[in-house]
Amino acid sequence: TITVYNPWKPGEIYDTYYLVKNEGQAVPTDGLKVVIPLKSIMTNSATHLGFLELLGELDKVTGVCNSNYIYNPTILQGVKDGTIKDLGDAFNLDIENLLLLHPQAVMTSAYNAEDENSRRMKQTGLPILYNIEWQEKSILGRAEWIKFIGAFFDKEKLADSIFSQIAEQYN
């Protein structure tokens, strides 16, 4: 179980994820069931790509936003080849093409407590994973979100190891 807390309303839960390896596994109704490891993901923030690269999961990216702000050569080649779809502006996502893409999950950076774009994405019925690392007050706090991403790919140990290396180098 992963719980993301609302950075704009301390103590309030933003979303809860129940990670399962079997689609038929029952989970509580107060959160979202996500079958892991993810096989495809769309992300609306270039910052998520660095984490995915460190985890060896760039090949799971099927959609991005604002590819003109992305400098990862693997992702840019995918956009050029058409294997990765650019869904436009992260603040005004192309919902129709998101539905056509149908990734297993959408990783998004919520931009405020009542994010209209997130509300529109939720209406698609696709699992929305809120990665709000940009709200962390410290660089290590931001880096620690690799553990969040790693969990969705069943790579918690690798994510912990990567974070430990980052923390050691930083300190």
Specify the residue positions occupied by each region the protein language model found.
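Aromatic-residue detector
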Residues: 1, 15-20, 32, 145, ...
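Extreme N-terminal leader/targeting regions
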Residues: 1-12, 116-121
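A short, structured surface patch at a secondary-structure boundary
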Residues: 6-99, 105-111
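Extracytoplasmic substrate-binding proteins
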Residues: 83, 96, 100-109, 113-171
